[in-house]
Amino acid sequence: MDIKAFKMDGLGNDFVIIDQRSQDFNLDKDQIIKICDRSFIGCDQLILIKKNKEIDANVEFFNSDGSISGACGNGTRCVADLLSKESGKKEITLLTTSGSLKSKILGNNLVETEIGIPKVNWQEIPLSKQLDTQDLKIEIIDRNNTKHIGGIAINVGNPHIIFFVDDIEAFDLKNIGPKIENHPLFPEKCNVTLAKVINRNLIKVKVWERGAGLTKACGTAACATAVAANINNLVEKTTDIEFVLGSLTISIDERNSIHMKGPVSDIKNINIKL
């Protein structure tokens, strides 16, 4: 089977995007895993674009382990840019399993997406039992065997836990990430972020992405981190979240809705042979 696809990324968070509006086929879990495997094509997530007569398109997100992801901020921005270049429209609306997302094309490869209102109640994360989502009291241990207890849970289309620490490099996230992702407190697993507040307009982060592992960037993690920092009055309503290859600007408006702005890569056409 020959598949026409696109490769894009947002700050190194990379995607294989397949437009199923013009290609009639289905992919099973094993095929998704193969496409995402970096010994084959390779990506953090695979994205399917599907027809929608009411809005621009439906999108489905799959992690590199073949699992479904309810939301993907950087992926949404990439698809919005792709469809904008196809249609000439400067505003793109996409329907995801987590709801409708609107994006604005700002030029110079910048795209802003409204992610919506975050969820902070324990049932909405969801957690397996009732706890204070602003202090989960989960223990993580740094490279010096020093224990740190905390964790803030936020759902921005998918579940996240954020640990604010003094030094994000003091932790082995490759070791900690899968343990927290699969913690019994999270029945749907979770994304794990280590965050250091630099000032009231900047936070540095490292992310372990649910179903994908260590990633260079994660849009929803940036959103969840900004929300958690705002709740605790650590930053302003607009703040930059810095990853290895650059930053996303996260703003929280008067309705408490999250807006994410950042760059997307150029579009690369690829062919996949399965």
UniProtKB/Swiss-Prot annotation:
Keywords associated with the record: Amino-acid biosynthesis, Cytoplasm, Isomerase, Lysine biosynthesis
Site (Could be important to modulate the pK values of the two catalytic cysteine residues): H160, E209
Catalytic residues (positions): C72, C218
Positions with a binding annotation for substrate: N13, Q45, N63, G73, N74, N158, N191, E209, R210, G219, T220
InterPro entries noted in UniProt: DAP_epimerase_AS, DAP_epimerase_DapF
Pfam families, sorted: DAP_epimerase
GO-annotated molecular function: diaminopimelate epimerase activity
Assigned GO CC terms: cytosol
Compartments where located: Cytoplasm
Gene Ontology BP annotations: lysine biosynthetic process via diaminopimelate
Metabolic or biological pathway: Amino-acid biosynthesis; L-lysine biosynthesis via DAP pathway; DL-2,6-diaminopimelate from LL-2,6-diaminopimelate: step 1/1
Record PROSITE patterns: DAP_EPIMERASE
EC numbers on record: 5.1.1.7
The family this protein is said to belong to: Belongs to the diaminopimelate epimerase family.
Function: Catalyzes the stereoinversion of LL-2,6-diaminopimelate (L,L-DAP) to meso-diaminopimelate (meso-DAP), a precursor of L-lysine and an essential component of the bacterial peptidoglycan.
Subunit structure: Homodimer.
PANTHER family registered for this protein in UniProt: DIAMINOPIMELATE EPIMERASE (PTHR31689:SF0), DIAMINOPIMELATE EPIMERASE, CHLOROPLASTIC (PTHR31689)
Protein known as: Diaminopimelate epimerase
Species of origin: Pelagibacter ubique (strain HTCC1062)
Name of the gene: dapF
